[in-house]
Amino acid sequence: MFLQKTIRKKTVVQGIGIHSGDPCTLTFRPAPADTGVYFIRTDLPGSPSLKVTARNVQATSHQTTIGGPAFSVATIEHCVSALSALRIDNLFIELDGPEIPIGDGSARVFLEALLAVGIVEQDQPRKYCYITEPIYFSEGEKHAYVVPYHGLRLTVTIDFPNPTIGKQTIDLDINEQSFGRDVANARTFGFMKDVEALKSRGLAKGGSLDNCIVLDGENVVNPEGLRWADEFVRHKCLDALGDLVTLEMPLMGHVVLYKAGHDVMNKLVRKIWDSPTSYRHVELGADISDEVRRYTGWTVPV
């Protein structure tokens, strides 16, 4: 039986907000079994909390923001992508402001902080959203679908007219090792013309070459260049993994994305919820292969 997990003890991440440029502090704290993942705004009266769920997603333009009637938390995807890869089910995430520290624009700072304090099993079984039939979502030239699979697999394709990016695809089985090796260090990216426009509107005050890949035409402005030639699609994989946390339950399925951003990911999660005959909520034993055959009738690839 696979058990739910949380962290062993609290850990703190400090940095600046990408839009405000202000210092901000994030504190990860253990949470009891069957809690889920909650953000807590300690800077507000009563320290209100907000669950990470697609139902609370308020904005999906260039990032994912969750919110309630009186407050919000912006750019959650880099942080929570690490939770998915580490199979952390229950966590309190305290914030002293509306933004999460941007770090270097990747998920590395969050992954390192969580691994440093350790991850512990809890006394309740881990419940999965087990895809049994294909689920599709399309919007113009953007496409997303999920099909049965014996783990979590992401195939992500992006296609930009800028030749430095162009068309890139990553196909990855997601686990702690593959995430740390192939995805966690991939940075967010943007174009110089867009950065200048954002700053003229009082946004992206914390943005710099230290936390974002910046392209000026076909040229990468960052002196150190790229960490991988396909760092762009690796980061989109990171984003998608973070957005899947809003499903509120770990997914077992193969997610295939084409030109799909945060908006499409939010709609895909909602489409899964709206397709109750295409998934089951299950607790998995040690023999994944037998479980897959029992619930889906699909054969696990050898």
Curated annotation (Swiss-Prot):
Active site residues according to the UniProt entry: H262
Source species, domain of life: Bacteria
Pfam families per UniProt: LpxC
Keywords noted in UniProt: Hydrolase, Lipid A biosynthesis, Lipid biosynthesis, Lipid metabolism, Metal-binding, Zinc
Cofactor: Zn(2+)
InterPro entries: Ribosomal_Su5_D2-typ_SF (IPR020568), UDP-acyl_GlcNac_deAcase (IPR004463), UDP-acyl_GlcNac_deAcase_C (IPR011334), UDP-acyl_N-AcGlcN_deAcase_N (IPR015870)
Keyword Lipid biosynthesis listed: yes
Main EC class the enzyme belongs to: hydrolase
Protein EC: 3.5.1.108
Any single GO BP term: lipid A biosynthetic process
HAMAP family: LpxC
Similarity annotation: Belongs to the LpxC family.
Function in brief: Catalyzes the hydrolysis of UDP-3-O-myristoyl-N-acetylglucosamine to form UDP-3-O-myristoylglucosamine and acetate, the committed step in lipid A biosynthesis.
Name the record gives this protein: UDP-3-O-acyl-N-acetylglucosamine deacetylase
Species for this entry: Bdellovibrio bacteriovorus (strain ATCC 15356 / DSM 50701 / NCIMB 9529 / HD100)
Organism lineage string: Bacteria, Pseudomonadati, Bdellovibrionota, Bdellovibrionia, Bdellovibrionales
